[in-house]
Curated annotation (Swiss-Prot):
Chain spans, region Disordered: 147-166
Annotated organism of origin: Mus musculus
Effects seen without this gene: No visible phenotype.
Family listed: Belongs to the Schlafen family.
Gene Ontology biological process: adaptive immune response; negative regulation of cell population proliferation; negative regulation of G1/S transition of mitotic cell cycle; negative regulation of T cell proliferation; negative regulation of transcription by RNA polymerase II; regulation of cell cycle; T cell proliferation
Compositionally biased tracts (Basic and acidic residues): 156-166
Chief location bin: cytoplasm
The keyword Nucleus is assigned to this record: yes
Protein name: Schlafen family member 1
GO cellular component, as recorded: cytoplasm; nucleus
């Protein structure tokens, strides 16, 4: 990605090549579609946060006509997520595609929110980890700032709804399961997934990779809500204990990666204590005919004192002649100003 000098005072940011059109983008390889989407949304985000200009991309498909083929559903969704309240101005000139950004579309840094591709700030919603949008993130951080942090356990008023008792029962069952020192293969367990409980089977040789993929959002979501339990080695459909084999991932290796992942999660504090993320990881033996055959990884995450991010917010701006990512401190300052 680079700035193009075309002899005009308008800033033009070159996003490289792109395949356009609803049908054409559907037939692309997923990796290529995601990479193109990322390049152009990154450029758009940077321009919106930095003033005005144009995003320029070379159209790869030669027969493309903007008015006839559209831009593509994935691009429309990504653009709306960055700038939900205003329509964007798309133009085609020969084999080039332009997105025009005017000052009126750029946030007022004194009162507005920074254009953001992903907040990377998660909460638990039911049995899922859900990313907060900008409004939810701002409210969440504002509440923590006003209170000077979060209490170690949620107040009853923080847990509204008729499902409170059931959630508490599920959490008690998960807590009892966490305390076990030995499990039996194929035995059923009695709790479902919930706001405070998630489990995965991951019966694959790529166990470590899969765990590393889900840990940031799951751990941060638990920490930002009321804490919770993550179990690796439980079958979601049959609700039975399956475990994982040590040959696919040694427990010590998995524990080390979990520790590394949690230590790397970005946090922001509004409290004096500035504590670290509190958690406990253990491995429970799974027995078959009296012999240890597999393991279940059990992770308990405590409610965090302030806010935990799955990764730094993905929000870009123009600085020193290039596209730079906001630091978490810069992003929070803009969001809460």
């Amino acid at each position: 990605m680079n700035i193009t000098d075309e002899g005009t005072p308008v800033l033009i940011l070159n996003a490289g090549g792109i395949t356009l059109g609803t049908e054409s983008r559907k037939t692309m390889e997923n990796h290529d579609r995601v990479e193109e989407n990322r390049n152009i949304t990154k450029a758009l985000c940077a321009l919106i946060n930095s003033g005005e200009g144009k995003v320029k991309a070379h159209i790869k498909n030669p027969d493309y006509i903007l008015s006839k083929h559209g831009i593509g559903e994935d691009l429309e969704t990504s653009f709306k997520n960055i700038l939900p309240s205003r329509p964007l101005d798309f133009k085609q000139y020969q084999s080039y595609f332009f997105i025009c950004v005017e000052k009126s579309q750029s946030p007022d840094v004194s009162v507005g929110k920074p254009a953001t591709i992903a907040t990377n700030l998660y909460m638990r919603n039911g049995a899922s980890s859900v990313e907060m949008n900008l409004d939810a993130a701002q409210k969440f951080l504002d509440n923590i700032k006003v209170a000077g942090g979060r209490s170690p356990s949620a107040r009853p008023s923080d847990r509204p709804g008729d499902d409170t008792q059931e959630e508490g029962h599920i959490q008690e069952l998960a807590a009892a399961f966490f305390k076990q020192s030995k499990l039996t293969k194929k035995e059923n367990f009695l709790f479902s997934e919930s706001k405070n409980v998630e489990y995965k089977s991951f019966e694959t040789k790529k166990l470590l990779q899969r765990v590393k993929e889900i840990l940031p959002r799951t751990v941060s979501a638990f920490a930002n809500t009321d804490g919770g339990y993550l179990f690796i080695g439980l079958d979601e459909k049959k609700q039975e204990i399956v475990g994982f084999e040590a040959k696919n991932c040694q427990p010590k290796c998995l524990e080390s990666e979990i520790e590394k992942c949690i230590q790397q999660l970005p946090v922001t504090h509004f409290c004096e204590e500035r504590e670290k993320i509190k958690y406990k990881c253990k491995f429970i033996e799974v027995h078959d005919s009296g012999v240890v055959c597999k393991y279940v990884c059990a992770l308990r995450v405590e409610r965090f004192c302030c806010a935990v991010f799955a990764a730094e917010p993905e929000s870009w701006h123009m600085k020193d002649g290039g596209v730079k990512r906001f630091t978490i401190e810069e992003w929070i300052k803009l969001l809460m100003s």
